[in-house]
């Protein structure tokens, strides 16, 4: 019941590669563990990034079987490293669904429209460009060829620094043309001091700032320093709780927030 609060989860599942665990699980076993965890959490809206599959045609059947009662929107890009993308699951039936393809990138954003507590909302599930730098591989490469590694790392960072603001602008352009209230979630791959966060958090509440505690780190490899996953909600919403769930199915931690909607303010943004 939306009047009792809406529970939202955002989680970069890291392509089900389980990099931090000593357990030798296959991607399928890791995916099953993640889905079992999400099913147990029983959130109203679930936004996943870096959802990996070998067979895109089987994604809907797999999720429909494992997550009964959820409306499903997904899109995966086919790459030479496999098929991965975003998934949005909701207890509310979607009125409309779509995706925003980021230019020159396999990253993307999904959007889904719902009626929440009698009002129209659009949920954005975003995965913005990362630096594509593995800390463990970086350390190993520095030992072998310091200068070349520095050059390669600099090139990766420049590409990300250029692409991410453009991707943010694409989402903001869609928001500007959207008549509904908007909630922006996902893996921003950027810190709270960044352009990415500054632009997207304007006129929105950061659920961590409203109800979270501690540093709020969501990237486990640099805990407790790095918060790069967010749930941003309209100012009309009241944030009842925000939690970082320390499950190591991925190099990110899932974040979960419960919000309530105030019907007295009808301004859209």
Write out the residue ranges for each language-model feature.
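Active-site environment of divalent metal-dependent phosphoester hydrolases
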Residues: 15-18, 51-57, 79-83, 106, ...
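Active-site flanking residues adjacent to catalytic metal/cofactor-binding acidic residues
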Residues: 11, 49, 126, 185-187
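Soluble or luminal CAZymes and related metallo-dependent hydrolases
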Residues: 26-30, 102-104, 156-170
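N-terminal, active-site-proximal structural segment of metallo-dependent hydrolase catalytic domains
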Residues: 1-62, 80, 168, 261-269
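Metal-dependent phosphoester-hydrolase catalytic domains
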Residues: 165-182, 188-269
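Residue-level detector of structured alpha->beta connecting loops
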Residues: 42, 91-93, 179, 236
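Acidic/histidine-rich helix-loop elements
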Residues: 10-29, 132-160
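Structured beta-strand-rich core segments of catalytic domains in phosphoester-bond hydrolases
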Residues: 1-5, 45, 49-136, 243-247
């Amino acid at each position: 019941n939306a009047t009792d609060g809406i529970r939202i989860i955002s989680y970069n599942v890291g392509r089900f590669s389980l990099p931090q665990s000593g357990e030798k699980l296959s991607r399928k076993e890791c995916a099953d563990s993640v889905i079992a965890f999400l099913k147990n959490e029983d959130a109203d809206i679930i936004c996943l990034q870096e959802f990996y599959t070998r067979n895109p045609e089987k994604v809907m059947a797999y999720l429909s079987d494992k997550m009964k009662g959820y409306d499903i929107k997904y899109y995966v890009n086919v790459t030479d490293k496999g098929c991965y993308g975003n998934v949005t699951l909701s207890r509310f039936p979607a009125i409309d669904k779509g995706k925003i393809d980021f230019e020159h990138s396999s990253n993307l954003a999904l959007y889904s429209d719902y009626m929440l507590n009698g009002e129209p909302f659009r949920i954005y599930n975003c995965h913005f460009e990362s630096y594509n730098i593995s800390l463990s591989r970086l350390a190993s490469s520095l030992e072998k060829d310091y200068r070349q590694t520095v050059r390669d790392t600099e090139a990766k960072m420049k590409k990300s620094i250029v692409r991410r603001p453009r991707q943010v602008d694409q989402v903001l352009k869609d928001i500007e043309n959207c008549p509904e209230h908007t909630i922006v979630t996902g893996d921003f791959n950027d810190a709270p001091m960044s352009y990415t966060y500054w632009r997207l958090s304007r006129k929105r509440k950061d659920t961590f700032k409203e109800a979270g505690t501690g540093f709020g780190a969501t990237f486990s490899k640099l805990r407790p320093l790095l918060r790069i996953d967010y749930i941003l909600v309209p100012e009309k919403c009241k944030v009842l709780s925000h939690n970082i769930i320390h499950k190591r199915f991925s190099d990110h931690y899932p974040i979960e927030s419960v919000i309530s909607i105030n019907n007295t303010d009808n301004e859209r943004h």
